[in-house]
């Protein structure tokens, strides 16, 4: 999917609400630093200072839109960043530009970091010849899920389910609460109706076969070592060829190739949203007529 088109997935009302909440969090009261700058027109350059994938432009825009500032992008969403590179220019009242600076940088850095990790994971997996899907998980930061899931998409990975309503997932605790695997899956099937699929988390071949027999659409083989994963998936697929198999738990960028196999349809990595390092961006003001530089020095 073209990263530039992903912006249309984001509800404008959600973008505005998120931007407003982030700005409110950072400045809920008096902003004394604004007295230093006043409201004179100002301009700044956004610099990327670490390599990776650019992601999060719609959120960056939404923040500065709230502050009556204009952003002009020099690179498209999904661009590969080779530092140091000029990414965008921002213009607006000085006090508003600086009010949005840190919030916008934090959002862009986090989203780009996730996109970069996702892009690396997809590249690692496809380099093995595997044709399945790399996905994130629901292990996201409360209040920041839209940004993080969007970053996965820009990086070429799948969201998995966005929230609890996107897929009925039966986990080990559901099985305990329901009384048995069969009861849990049957109740999930009834709740799902025709629009939703049912996925069941399994920790053994026995559980996987029970889940498929009960009507699961997807079986997650959770925390399997690669040497156990592939024989289990092969046995499951041989008996239930229409059931999709997901590998999850303990997967990192380093060991990802070991989880790729012909009987694995999806590999999900919690680390894409939990452990991806943020990229380094800076926003530097410059005087009209001066040449913008990434590291401004006072003389």
Curated annotation (Swiss-Prot):
Description of how the protein assembles with itself and partners: Hexamer formed by 3 homodimers.
Family in the record: Belongs to the NadC/ModD family.
Name of the protein described by the UniProt record: Nicotinate-nucleotide pyrophosphorylase [carboxylating]
Organism: Rattus norvegicus
Broad enzyme group: transferase
Transmembrane annotation, as ranges: none
Binding residues annotated for quinolinate, in chain numbering: 102, 138-139, 160-161, 171, 201, 222, 248-250, 270
Annotated keywords: Glycosyltransferase, Pyridine nucleotide biosynthesis, Transferase
Pfam families assigned: QRPTase_C, QRPTase_N
Its EC number(s): 2.4.2.19
Span list, region Important for hexamer formation: 8-12
InterPro entries, per database record: Aldolase_TIM, NadC, NadC/ModD, Nicotinate_pribotase-like_C, Quinolinate_PRibosylTase_N_sf, Quinolinate_PRibosylTrfase_C, Quinolinate_PRibosylTrfase_N
GO biological process: NAD biosynthetic process; quinolinate catabolic process; quinolinate metabolic process
Gene3D superfamilies in UniProt: Aldolase class I, Quinolinate phosphoribosyl transferase, N-terminal domain
Taxonomic lineage of the native organism: Eukaryota, Metazoa, Chordata, Craniata, Vertebrata
Gene Ontology molecular function terms on file: identical protein binding; nicotinate-nucleotide diphosphorylase (carboxylating) activity
